[in-house]
């Protein structure tokens, strides 16, 4: 009830609501826009929201972009006792930027995917790859849509392999993972 009265007070402060009347009719849309504080626009919105990638992959991407995946560095921050080293390379501490494209396995997977899509460039760091995928997601060209979708599916595929290594000590070769990613992209076009 307090929230309703608070919103009423805000409307009264705005001039009694007369600014929301057009041609003698109260426009709820105008009042809503006035009362509703719009959130900050994020640059990755089109990458996640307009993706043709599978819903599971898109959700994992959404978590990864916001650095909300349960990587070992985050588990340690939550006071969960885990070994901080990466489950795939067993050399460096696992965080989002390490997991995605800072070690050999993920780099090989992403390189193979890029080569099969006809993209001739080296693998970049996590934030640079996200920026590249965001740029591709803004385009309507089929090749760019495929690249953005492949990026999302690659993040998901690498995440699955990381989980498979941790929970069942099994990891597929980068070629198998890359081919599965490309198959998913081809099926969803």
Please state what every model-predicted region is:
Residues 1-189:
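A helix-boundary/hinge signal
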